[in-house]
Design a protein with these regions (language model features):
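Conserved RNA-binding domains used in RNP assembly and mRNA/RNA metabolism
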Residues: 2-92
Length: 92
């Protein structure tokens, strides 16, 4: 099997929040978007979006599961947290 490098990323991003309760305009003005975190492998990235997966299969054909598509416009930061080598003598 050919060796492949897989990188595990931590992505910090902003998400929409909402509420159905009654509130003063002043209190509502203090509300903020939710800060969310996704951990996984980046399986696709272009100028509009980044797609993460936190599961992959080593069978042929390789497949991925548990995908999260995040618009790049809401991503605050991406941090590389781990690199693994798939295949080869010391791989998975």
């Amino acid at each position: 099997m050919k060796s492949k490098i897989k990188k595990i990323w931590l992505c910090k991003w902003k998400d929409i929040t909402g509420s159905a309760d009654w509130s003063s305009p002043e209190r509502a003005a203090k509300e903020e978007p939710a800060i969310c975190y996704t951990v996984g492998f980046i399986v696709h990235q272009d100028k509009h979006k980044t797609i993460f997966s936190n599961e992959f299969s080593l069978v042929d054909p390789a497949e991925i599961g548990n995908r999260t598509v995040i618009p790049n416009s809401v991503i605050v930061k991406k941090t590389l947290i781990h690199t693994i080598k798939e295949g080869g003598k010391h791989g998975m």
